[in-house]
């Protein structure tokens, strides 16, 4: 079966998911419209989205290709191809807050037209089925930059990097909060910002890098449940056994912190669980802590195991979108590229959800990238891809999440 033809190019069909008046509206809000002359804000966003879809390696790559398809561009909301200098200047000087605002506005729009997209966007394979609450997975990822970014993103002695702190909704496998900063921002310091929008009754799961007992106590007061790993130097006193050891659960106890400062920061009791967990094919003892005193110890272990979903999320972005070669060196240009990468991701995820795509995200990306300028119905293209035989690979596994130049934690 061949894909059916369409009067629009695949690129136009993807870009059409962004509301027509949204980009001009945000350009006025952030003052970008005053900076635009021949290269409109819409043309700027389209060029960056195309750079993500084509996995472009640089400014010339994007500019040359867009000039070669100038006729098709004019049909996409009268956008125009940029000059190299004009594109570079726009990335460097136009307020990147517009790109961030655009991402959240488009995500909100997609949620409004299809509410089930956000609540059931994609069921992660390791999602603990016994939990009906919202599960928020929190982590950060370091994005390596070139040495030219040292003036604003110095990371260690001779390296530059940005860091993306992200809160992932495990029901939909979509981000619910993102903050992009230089890599010297410590995870624990960003924890309050990342968790600010979490509601009472929801669950937060994060690595021990985010452990700040002042913040953990604030979450307890707010009615938020949390699960994390215990640091090796945590001082505590066992108050009693919570439940008997069973299977991979070595110890389940109720404790009270005894550190000079931590006992003041977190005056209530909490749960400490020692368990054997499989890591990279080997059994390893891990220690978890939580403020929930009712769940089974195995459920708390399952919740932390679900945290590895965020590594799969970072892997999907790294393997498909362009977060290795950047189109500019200053902070503004880097932020434009990161936010348009996330924008492209949610557009493709929405297409995957609408088409009931059952293969990997990477295959969806490559299927559409190959016909980006063709006048084919993109859903028909994906339907044809789905006719191939063989075992369907649903999505990446956490143990495969090795990201060159994109370190998690």
Regions found by a protein language model. Give the residues of each.
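Extended, highly charged
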Residues: 96, 121
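Phosphate-interacting basic helix/loop segments used at nucleotide- and nucleic-acid interfaces
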Residues: 116-119
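Single, function-defining residue in the core of a domain
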Residues: 1-61, 65-66, 92-94, 101-105, ...
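Major-groove recognition helix of helix-turn-helix-like DNA-binding domains
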Residues: 75-94
């Amino acid at each position: 079966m061949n894909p059916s033809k369409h009067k629009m190019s695949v690129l136009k069909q993807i870009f059409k998911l962004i509301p027509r008046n949204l980009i001009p509206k945000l350009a006025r809000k952030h003052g970008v419209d005053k900076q635009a002359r021949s290269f409109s804000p819409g043309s700027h966003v389209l060029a960056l989205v195309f750079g993500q879809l084509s996995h472009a390696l640089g400014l010339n790559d994007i500019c040359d290709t867009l000039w070669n398809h100038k006729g098709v561009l004019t049909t996409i909301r009268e956008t125009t191809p940029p000059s190299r200098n004009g594109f570079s200047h726009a990335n460097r000087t136009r307020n990147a807050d517009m790109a961030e605002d655009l991402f959240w506005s488009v995500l909100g729009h997609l949620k409004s037209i299809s509410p089930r997209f956000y609540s059931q966007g994609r069921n992660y394979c390791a999602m603990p089925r016994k939990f009906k609450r919202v599960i928020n997975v929190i982590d950060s990822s370091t994005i390596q930059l070139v040495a030219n970014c040292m003036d604003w993103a110095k990371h260690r002695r001779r390296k530059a990097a940005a860091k993306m702190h992200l809160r992932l909704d495990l029901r939909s496998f979509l981000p619910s909060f993102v903050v992009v900063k230089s890599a010297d921002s410590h995870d624990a310091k960003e924890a309050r910002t990342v968790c600010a929008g979490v509601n009472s009754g929801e669950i937060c799961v994060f690595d021990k890098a985010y452990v700040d007992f002042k913040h953990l106590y604030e979450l307890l007061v707010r009615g938020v449940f949390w699960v994390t790993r215990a640091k090796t130097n945590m001082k505590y006193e066992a108050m009693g056994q919570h439940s008997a050891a069973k299977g991979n659960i070595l110890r389940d106890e109720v404790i009270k912190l005894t550190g000079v400062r931590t006992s003041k920061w977190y005056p209530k009791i909490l749960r400490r669980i020692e368990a054997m967990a499989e890591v990279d094919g080997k059994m390893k003892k891990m220690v978890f802590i939580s403020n929930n005193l009712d769940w089974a110890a195995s459920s708390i272990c399952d919740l932390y195991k679900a945290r590895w979903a965020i590594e799969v999320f970072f892997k999907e972005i790294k393997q498909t979108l362009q977060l290795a070669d950047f189109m500019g060196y200053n902070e503004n240009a880097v932020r434009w590229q990161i936010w348009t990468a996330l924008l492209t991701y949610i557009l493709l995820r929405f297409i995957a959800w609408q088409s009931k795509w059952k293969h990997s995200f990477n295959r969806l990306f490559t299927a559409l990238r190959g016909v980006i300028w063709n006048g084919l119905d993109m859903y028909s293209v994906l339907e044809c891809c789905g006719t191939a035989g063989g075992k369907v690979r649903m999505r990446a596994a956490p143990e495969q999440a090795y990201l060159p130049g994109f370190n998690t934690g």
